Amino acid sequence: MADTKMKALERLKEDLEKVYLGPLWEKLGKMVTPEPDHEVVPYLWKWETIRKHLLEAGELLRLGRESERRVVYLQNPSLLKHGLIGYSTNTLYVGVQLLLPGEVAPAHRHSQSAIRFIIEGEGAYTAVDGERTYMERGDLILTPAWTWHDHGHEGTEPVIWMDGLDVGLVRNFAGSFFEPYSEDVFPVAGPHNGSTFKYSTGALRPVTDRKRKGYPSPLIAYKWKTTKQVLENLSKLDPDPYDGYAVDYINPLTGRSADLRIGTTMQKLTPGMHTKAHRHVHSAVYHVLDGEGYTIINGVKFEWSKGDFFILPPWSWHEHVNTGEGDAHLFSINDLPIMELLDLEREEAYNKNGGHQSIIDVFQPTL
């Protein structure tokens, strides 16, 4: 009797598959998992490898409508097999962009939110809906979803920055739209760096903006010199046990994330600092602004130095160590705003071994 029933169930399963139906009694555990289930792997790229290939692209590729952006993106190896091109995590895309003197990256807009974090060089600007903001190393620049934006270079040296977009998130929601502007440059509107003049402190609001909507953020550029000073002030207090001295970039009108969908964080690790391990649902991609050290992710040691990038997958144990003689600054983007909005975010402390993982392996980057 049991064998007959099993054979009947197997036939039923085959019949269901033929008409694109499925037996939930067999697949429930795949759909509703006890903990987050994903295929994102941690990975690290050395800066010299990225920069070498990016400069080579600079010699071979000229900007224009045929190639609007000269970017090398960070591909999560485990997601490529599913055709998820350009995915660094399930939700986030990170690329590294090069702009040469005299070039213009043509104006366009898209559904994806985007941030720029400046890595090296000066003399270039990003224009958002016509407001030009000149970029310096360590600055965070916002280009909110569906805003016209272009980049231009009036300086004399290559400028390189990090791009962060919510490509995976928007694709999963089937919400992607893209539109090129009719000209290479969107018409200039207002004074250069205007939003910085108005909102540089983040704690004061011009009376003329009392009725301004909260999104997008009225501040386009978050200057490194301001962020660094805040971190210096914060260093007079006790550090966070998991992130050291860390700040989130916020919208000065709402007090929430600077971008509605992409979280941005800068953290400072003082010499010898070893944070405790924890894990959370949101994923992140890190860039090492300066310093040297390592991060342990699920027991694997990822050694980093100035310029490197590394991926933190969702729900992964992690802790940071500064092995250098000076401060280390780690910039990161994350999908925390969306996880909080959807009430999916959770955080858990690692309670074994005094809050520190044992190292079981050391990651070897591909050079």
Pin down the residues of each PLM region.
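Conserved metal-binding segment of the jelly-roll/cupin
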Residues: 128, 134-156, 161-166, 297, ...
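C-terminal functional regions that serve as terminal interaction/effector modules
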Residues: 2-48, 253-256, 260, 271, ...
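A short, N-terminal "cap"/entry segment at the start of jelly-roll beta-barrel domains
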Residues: 2-89, 180, 186-261, 265, ...
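A short hydrophobic beta-strand segment most commonly corresponding to one strand
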Residues: 115-117, 142, 156-176, 286, ...
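Contiguous mid-protein beta-loop-alpha structural module that forms a pocket-lining wall or clamp
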Residues: 145-199
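Short histidine-centered beta-strand/loop micro-motifs
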Residues: 83-88, 104-110, 152-153, 258, ...
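A short beta-strand-loop-beta hairpin characteristic of the jelly-roll/cupin
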Residues: 100, 104-137, 144-147, 152, ...
